[in-house]
Swiss-Prot record:
Single strand-specific metallo-endoribonuclease involved in late-stage 70S ribosome quality control and in maturation of the 3' terminus of the 16S rRNA. The lineage of its organism: Bacteria, Pseudomonadati, Bacteroidota, Flavobacteriia, Flavobacteriales. Belongs to the endoribonuclease YbeY family. It holds the Pfam family YbeY. Its EC number is 3.1.-.-. Zn(2+) binds at H105, H109, D115. It comes from Flavobacterium johnsoniae (strain ATCC 17061 / DSM 2064 / JCM 8514 / BCRC 14874 / CCUG 350202 / NBRC 14942 / NCIMB 11054 / UW101) (Cytophaga johnsonae). This is Endoribonuclease YbeY.
């Protein structure tokens, strides 16, 4: 089950479309969907988590806590809407595209993808692009 929680004024326009897409992303990686909680927040909220739990005194766009067991992926994914907005501007993409990238990024970590080395980051980026292309909304 995928849940969306809001600790900021932001909210997704079409939660069902995002849920369907993220579920498809999980299936495409041959994983089972457990309980995944997305928590949308601001920089201050996520910075506190970054300092308290990871001992990193920096801003970030996403922090994920992985509770995956075997093939069933579960976890809490915190997303700073402010960072996503700034990154979208920095990368010259729409807010929605950058948001999809971040949402997929969290799932991909749970599927075992890493991004610390250049090679891993390149694979992660490729997987993000692949998963973003899977998103569609029925018109």
């Amino acid at each position: 089950m995928i849940n969306f929680n809001y600790e900021t004024e932001f909210s997704l326009d079409n939660e069902q479309a995002f849920t369907d897409w993220l579920s498809a992303v999980i299936v495409s990686e041959e994983k089972n969907e457990g309980e995944i909680n997305y928590i949308f927040c601001d920089d201050e909220y996520l910075h506190k988590i970054n300092v308290e739990y990871l001992n990193h005194d920096t801003l970030t766009d996403i922090i994920s806590f992985d509770y995956t067991v075997g093939n069933e992926i579960s976890g809490d994914i915190f997303v700073s809407v402010e960072r996503v907005e700034d990154n979208a501007k920095d990368f010259n993409v729409s807010f929605e595209e950058e948001l999809k990238r971040v949402l997929a990024h969290g799932i991909l970590h749970y599927c075992g993808y890493k991004d610390k080395s250049d090679a891993d980051a390149e694979l992660m980026r490729s997987k993000e692009d692949e998963k973003i292309a899977m998103f569609h909304v029925e018109q």
